[in-house]
């Protein structure tokens, strides 16, 4: 069964007014897909995302069904989809990534070091790497399915889509981020940053894509967090770190990865799943 669209790590089946989103075991870094699979990665990401959508069920979203046996024929009980897929409403995608940062890290830290800004917003001097921001900062990006997303300022996004829609996206993104941060904190996890995606269906803004997975978010453990360094992430950062030690030029084809690294990645994904599901199993407030 061939998907209608095959992304770096996700397969999409177009059913007309609905879509099936299937999370594969493929892994990518620097926008390049690697030849090996990480066993069960797709199922882990799917379970995490579904658990968050259920937790935030008060926020309108695109989910229709999470159990393959209730998918339309001929997709019912299909082994390639089992446990890693969701049936969703097709909507008009808003082509922006709504990134929220609670800490100054990654590309945000690089920008601040160079320019004293974060997404074009001037920040006070004296911030250190991985320091918590006084309040979450909204740093949008234009989606680019063929390559790197383009970071833009709040003002530029507002000018492109209008003040009303911009305010809705910003407010929803920061609200979900704050609620999720409070929830995972109870399990000793820090939500450093994440990205949300939204669509429009019947005139309503709804939450789409994946939600608060370790592929769309940066999670840290409170046990290893420290200001002034880049703390170990509970995600595929170990893959990026490994690649930085090689001579690979970050262009296709991707190199083969050591078996022990694949196993370590698998364990990382399973660990963050256990931690997150222990939080999201409680009823959304």
Curated annotation (Swiss-Prot):
Keywords: ATP-binding, Ligase, Nucleotide-binding, Purine biosynthesis
PANTHER family according to UniProt: PHOSPHORIBOSYLAMINOIMIDAZOLE-SUCCINOCARBOXAMIDE SYNTHASE (PTHR43700:SF1)
Species in which this protein is naturally found: Leptospira interrogans serogroup Icterohaemorrhagiae serovar copenhageni (strain Fiocruz L1-130)
Pathway(s) of this molecule: Purine metabolism; IMP biosynthesis via de novo pathway; 5-amino-1-(5-phospho-D-ribosyl)imidazole-4-carboxamide from 5-amino-1-(5-phospho-D-ribosyl)imidazole-4-carboxylate: step 1/2
HAMAP family per the UniProt record, alphabetical: SAICAR_synth
Catalytic activity, as annotated: 5-amino-1-(5-phospho-D-ribosyl)imidazole-4-carboxylate + L-aspartate + ATP = (2S)-2-[5-amino-1-(5-phospho-beta-D-ribosyl)imidazole-4-carboxamido]succinate + ADP + phosphate + 2 H(+)
Record-linked Pfam families: SAICAR_synt
Documented EC number(s): 6.3.2.6
Family matches, as NCBIfam families: PRK13961.1, purC
Cell division is among the record's keywords: no
UniProt similarity note: Belongs to the SAICAR synthetase family.
InterPro entries assigned to the protein according to its UniProt record, in alphabetical order: SAICAR_synt/ADE2_N, SAICAR_synth, SAICAR_synthetase_CS
GO cellular component terms attached to this protein's record: cytoplasm
Protein origin, superkingdom: Bacteria
GO terms for MF: ATP binding; phosphoribosylaminoimidazolesuccinocarboxamide synthase activity
GO biological processes: 'de novo' IMP biosynthetic process
Name of the featured protein: Phosphoribosylaminoimidazole-succinocarboxamide synthase
């Amino acid at each position: 069964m061939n998907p209608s669209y095959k992304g770096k790590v996700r397969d999409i089946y177009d059913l007309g007014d609905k879509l099936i989103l299937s999370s594969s075991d493929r892994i990518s870094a620097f926008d390049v897909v690697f030849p090996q699979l990480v066993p069960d990665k797709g199922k882990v990401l799917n379970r995490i995302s579904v658990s968050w959508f259920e937790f935030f069920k008060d926020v309108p979203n695109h989910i229709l069904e999470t159990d393959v046996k209730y998918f339309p024929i001929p997709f019912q009980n299909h082994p390639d989809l089992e446990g890693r897929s969701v049936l969703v409403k097709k909507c008009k995608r808003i082509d922006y990534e709504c990134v929220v940062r609670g800490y100054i890290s990654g590309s945000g830290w690089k920008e601040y070091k160079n320019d004293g800004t974060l997404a074009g917003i001037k920040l006070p001097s004296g911030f250190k790497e991985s320091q918590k921001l006084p309040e979450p900062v909204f740093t949008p990006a234009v989606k680019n399915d063929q390559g790197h997303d383009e970071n833009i300022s709040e003002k530029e996004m507002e000018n492109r889509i209008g003040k009303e829609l911009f305010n809705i996206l910003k407010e929803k993104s920061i609200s979900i981020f704050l609620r999720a941060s409070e929830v995972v904190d109870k399990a000793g996890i820090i939500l450093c940053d994440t990205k949300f995606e939204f669509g429009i269906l019947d005139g309503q803004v709804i939450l789409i894509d994946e939600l608060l997975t370790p592929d769309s978010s940066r999670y840290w453990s409170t046990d290893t967090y420290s200001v002034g360094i880049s703390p170990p992430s509970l995600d595929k950062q170990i893959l990026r770190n490994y690649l930085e030690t090689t001579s690979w030029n970050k262009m296709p084809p991707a190199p083969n990865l050591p078996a022990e690294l694949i196993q370590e990645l698998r364990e990382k994904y399973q660990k963050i799943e256990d931690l997150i599901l222990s939080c999201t199993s409680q009823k959304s407030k």
